[in-house]
From Swiss-Prot:
The name this protein goes by in its record: Proton-associated sugar transporter A
Gene: Slc45a1
Transmembrane intervals: 93-113, 123-143, 155-175, 191-211, 233-253, 268-288, 536-556, 576-596, 606-626, 630-650, 688-708, 710-730
GO cellular component, one term: membrane
Family label: Belongs to the glycoside-pentoside-hexuronide (GPH) cation symporter transporter (TC 2.A.2) family.
Length: 751
């Protein structure tokens, strides 16, 4: 017969006792109604049909939501989904930079040639800036990875580089006037040439270097889904900025009253560019908040494993006289607080990760586990089956000793007071005179581990300690793997090191030796991607830096060194202006292609998109040298935008995919962890390396050929070479070895 529920016995010590037959049943007079609500319908059947209790095994109740204190959870790696406007404002800096860069590429070569710079030397103007970028770009990237400014890691670099670009632009477009104010004459522009070259170097280096922290800024504050959208929006803004820049440069401002009031063509361009760059920089800096990085010496709050209670179980009967007596009402409220959820359900929904339980009762665990990385959770799940029994419940000799893992939340400090007859105790709680111990603690304590992998889920045994020696007095409670997760998920120290490893900077200080080691030990996939990126920029920069000169000399048959009143000089100026409109077509085609690139990625593979971009550019530059028809040459500019959009998007998207592999990202434990800022800088260094080679080769090549046709031939040939390399050598997917190993674990089949 099932005895009726009665008041708590006076000998109860910490938690109330129950009769053995009511092991899964809460006493009506001692427990809150919320506890009984957890009992499943099968347990209710058990109570309604006591004679059939041998054949109906009660289901264990579901665990509560994960009671993890919110202040101990580091949500730095969790990013909310960004809106379109946030991503748009975040990419505004690309609009301003490309607007400025359009002015530079359109007017640097004509301005320097008109000031008397020899043909053999004007290509070397582009040589100094890429040298500085190639040497300093990795250092800037590594520095930004470790920057501890309260404004964030990337935004201080964006601000400084934007200011540098504005100063360089001021010297570039006003160098001739400043030189005339110093000591230049109408036939000697040595000061003007020097100031213009300095402006080109500063402007080019700052504008190109600002791309890297802007990309890293977006990747830091966005999740994986928003990163692809952000890269496409960045390419879109870059294309629009270049397009509007070439539109402004292609207008004859000298013929307008506004241009005459400001002092000429270059003055109007300078005013437009300075305002655009300043406004877009401010919009980017205030777009999305950036979390500051903790200094190396600052100790972060350790996120220990939350004290996860077992599914609400009947309290364990303690021996009479063991410990201090506790009033029944106090013990009841204490147990109710232990068994009730103390954290609100997480608003996060499981989207990623292999740990998503099919048990609907594990809602809190699912939400908490899905908010962290898959590798972290899966590594903890494997520990479920490799760890040994660590806590034991000591019982009288008449009862078999069974292993149990009990984890209760700590009672608040205000609970321990003399009025309630309970004092704070450190360490295990001693019960009885025979030395038996009941350890009631949390998973925060260090626990020894046993070796070996179990081939089946472990079983938690909850003994029935209240009665005799029959088979039902030591009935085992079988708990499935999903329910054990509620007790052993988030194993303290190991989980903390895994969680903080990806978000905190490496303990190794920044040095040139460490940077060189990172470059030397570059993974093969990244090395091939860098080579392919180099070939793309080598072909593109050759066309971009000399396109307006190509239009003026080849298409319009002009001469930049002819007298200013001659027809040849006027033809050359008309060709430069028309070249600006050609670059405008290229820029808007890049913006359009960037807008549809996300849809194309759903239909075509990244390998195919790479192949199409290189092939289209090679055909476009090659056919431009074979035709003198202005409309044909301008229409071919659309192919240039396809390659530009590809170079601004796909390499960084592949790099993000590479970082999903633990093998590629490395580990802080063995010193192989890579930094996103450094690897983005390594990709960007290929742009500088390509510009260095263009500066060294294309000047003599143009002199040897006799026109700018040689530049277009060179760009077409390199583009076809990149087309082959992207198809044969680039790695587009790194197999996740770790994930495959975890999936082969038989234990995960019980989730």
């Amino acid at each position: 017969m099932i005895p009726p529920a009665s008041s708590t016995p006076p000998g109860e010590a910490v938690i109330p006792s129950v009769a053995p037959q009511d092991f899964w049943r809460s006493p009506i007079s001692s427990y809150s109604g919320s506890v009984t609500g957890h009992i499943s319908h099968r347990a209710n059947n058990f109570k309604r049909h006591p004679k059939r209790r041998k054949y109906i095994r009660p289901s264990p109740p579901p665990p509560p939501n994960t009671p993890c204190p919110i202040e101990l959870v580091d949500f730095g790696d969790l990013h909310p989904q960004r809106s379109f406007w946030e991503l748009l404002f975040n990419g505004c800096i690309l609009f301003g930079i490309e607007f400025s860069y359009a002015m530079e590429t359109a007017y640097v070569t004509p301005v320097l040639l008109q000031m008397g710079l020899p043909d053999q030397l004007y290509s070397l103007v582009w040589f100094i800036s890429p040298i500085l970028g190639f040497l300093l770009q990795p250092l800037l990237g590594a520095w930004s990875d470790r920057c501890t400014s309260r404004f964030g890691r990337r935004r201080p670099f964006i601000l400084v580089l934007a200011i540098g670009a504005l100063l360089g632009l001021s010297l570039l477009l006003n160098g001739r006037d400043i030189g005339m104010a110093l000591a230049d004459t109408a036939t000697n522009h040595k000061w003007g040439i020097l100031l213009t070259v300095c402006g080109v170097v500063l402007m080019d280096f700052s504008a190109d270097s600002a791309d890297n922290p802007s990309h890293a800024y977006m990747m830091d504050v966005c999740g994986p889904v928003d990163q692809d959208r952000g890269l496409n929006i960045h390419a879109l803004m870059a294309g629009l900025g270049g397009g509007f820049g070439y539109v402004v440069g292609g207008i004859h401002w000298d013929k307008t009253s506004f241009g005459r009031a400001l002092g000429g063509q270059l003055r109007v361009i300078y005013v437009f560019t300075a305002i655009t760059l300043s406004v877009t920089t401010v919009l980017t800096l205030i777009s999305i908040p950036e979390r500051p990085l903790r200094p190396l010496g600052e100790k972060r709050t350790a996120m220990k494993s939350p004290s996860l209670p077992l599914p609400p179980s009947p309290p364990v009967l303690l021996e009479e006289g063991a410990g201090d007596a506790l009033p029944s009402t106090t013990a009841t409220s204490l147990y109710a607080s232990f068994s009730s959820p103390i954290s609100p359900p997480s608003p996060l929904t499981p989207k990623y990760g292999s740990f998503i339980s099919r048990d609907s009762s594990l809602t809190g665990i699912n939400e908490f586990a899905s908010s962290f990385g898959t590798s972290n959770i899966d590594s903890v799940l494997i520990d479920c089956f490799t760890a040994g029994h660590d806590n034991y419940l000591a019982l009288p000799s008449s009862v078999p000793r069974q292993a149990i893992s009990v984890s209760f939340p700590r009672a608040p400090d205000g609970f321990y007071c003399q009025e309630r007859g309970l004092e704070r105790r450190e360490g295990p709680l001693t019960l009885g005179s025979d030395g038996d111990v009941l350890r009631v603690g949390s998973l925060d304590t260090s626990k020894p581990r046993a070796s070996g992998i179990l081939k089946r889920p472990q079983t938690l045994a909850l003994p029935d300690v209240a009665g005799g020696n029959g088979p039902e007095t030591s009935r085992r409670r079988n708990v499935t793997f999903s329910q054990q997760v509620a007790n052993i998920l988030l194993n303290g120290v190991k989980y903390e090191s895994e969680l903080t490893g990806s978000s905190e900077q490496s303990e190794q200080p920044l040095s040139l030796r460490h940077l060189c080691s990172t470059i030397y030990n570059m993974p093969k996939a990244l090395r091939n991607l860098c080579v392919n990126h180099f070939l793309g920029w080598l072909s593109f920069e050759g066309m971009l830096l000399f396109y307006t000169d190509f239009m003026g000399e080849v298409v319009f048959q002009g001469d930049p060194k002819a007298p200013h009143t001659s027809e040849a000089y006027q033809k050359y100026n008309s060709g430069v202006t028309m070249g600006c409109w050609g670059m405008c077509i290229y820029a808007f085609s890049a913006a359009f292609y960037s807008a549809i690139l996300e849809k194309l990625e759903e239909c075509l593979s990244v390998r195919t998109l790479y192949f199409i971009a290189y092939l289209a550019f090679g055909l476009g530059t090659g056919l431009a040298t074979l035709s003198r028809n202005l409309y044909v040459v301008l229409s071919l500019c659309t192919t240039y935008g396809i390659l530009f959009s590809t170079l601004c998007t796909l390499p960084y998207s592949l790099l993000c995919d590479y970082y999903q592999s633990k093998k590629f990202a490395g580990s802080s434990a063995d010193g192989t962890r890579r930094g996103m800022g450094v690897d983005i800088s390594l990709l960007s260094c290929q742009y500088f390396l390509a510009q260095i080679l263009v500066s060294l080769v294309l000047g003599p090549l143009t002199s040897a050929v006799g026109s700018a046709n040689g530049v277009m031939y060179f760009s077409s040939l390199v583009s076809f070479l990149g087309c082959l390399y992207s198809s044969l050598c680039v790695t587009y997917e790194i197999p996740s070895v770790d994930a495959a190993d975890e999936e082969r674990q038989p234990l995960l089949l019980n989730v």
